[in-house]
């Protein structure tokens, strides 16, 4: 799910892709590891798109290239500094239809029977199909100069992020001759006891969210969990 963006790119560039556990170590589940077979050399590549700045030791030892979204320079282990590269933000996309989501998900589950979390494995394939949009939907359009749309998540441990997002919504609402639409996603109403956060009655489906975001005069981005580069930044770009 989190690495569908990279899988999409690989499937577009390489036609012969094989899913296998052979040649790989027991990595943290939040990664994408693959071996690129070139004419003169094989390259072992490990992609980390997690929120935090930490590193996976097994990934560092195994890989030739350790590509990471969220990096703090002073946390890079010196002995591996030459293989660590920043790759910027990413976001999940729909890469399989329902039929292929089921077929490929089950096929890869059978090939990887040592995995303990079968539900998470299957849900990753389902979620990219159910909740995300194909990359072709990410095309700019002419914005409406009288309209601002912004929808965001409330985070329990990121008060500054919530505060920044709330202030943007408040400022956008106060602008004359401009229509603001949006708010915080529902599901964490208990956080609103001491605040006045505008919480939506229902979530926007993803295609509608994209259309309204593209129509909006401006986009607003903040660091998210653990100060990470969130999906919104990648989508906005």
Residue ranges: model-predicted function:
Residues 1-234:
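Nucleotide-sugar donor-binding catalytic core of glycosyltransferases
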Residues 237:
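A short, conserved alpha-helix in the catalytic core of glycosyltransferases
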């Amino acid at each position: 799910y989190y690495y569908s963006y990279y899988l999409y790119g690989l499937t577009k560039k390489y036609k012969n892709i094989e899913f296998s556990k052979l040649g790989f170590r027991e990595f943290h589940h939040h990664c994408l590891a693959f071996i690129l077979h070139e004419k003169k050399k094989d390259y072992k590549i490990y992609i980390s798109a997690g929120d935090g700045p930490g590193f996976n030791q097994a990934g560092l030892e195994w890989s030739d290239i350790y590509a990471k979204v969220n990096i703090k320079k002073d946390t890079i282990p010196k002995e591996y500094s030459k293989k660590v590269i920043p790759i910027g933000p990413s976001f999940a996309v729909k890469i399989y239809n329902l039929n292929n989501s089921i077929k490929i998900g089950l096929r890869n589950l059978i090939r990887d029977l040592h995995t303990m979390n079968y539900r998470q494995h299957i849900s990753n394939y389902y979620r990219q199909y159910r909740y995300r949009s194909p990359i072709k939907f990410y095309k700019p359009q002419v914005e409406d100069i009288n309209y601002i749309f912004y929808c965001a998540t409330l985070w329990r441990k990121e008060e500054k992020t919530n505060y920044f997002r709330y202030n943007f919504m408040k400022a956008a609402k106060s602008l004359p001759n401009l229509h603001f639409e949006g708010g915080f996603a529902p599901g964490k109403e208990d956080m609103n006891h001491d605040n006045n956060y505008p919480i939506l009655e229902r979530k926007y489906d993803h295609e509608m969210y994209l259309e309204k975001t593209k129509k909006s005069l401006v986009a607003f981005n903040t660091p998210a969990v653990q100060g990470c580069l969130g999906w919104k930044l990648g989508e906005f770009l």
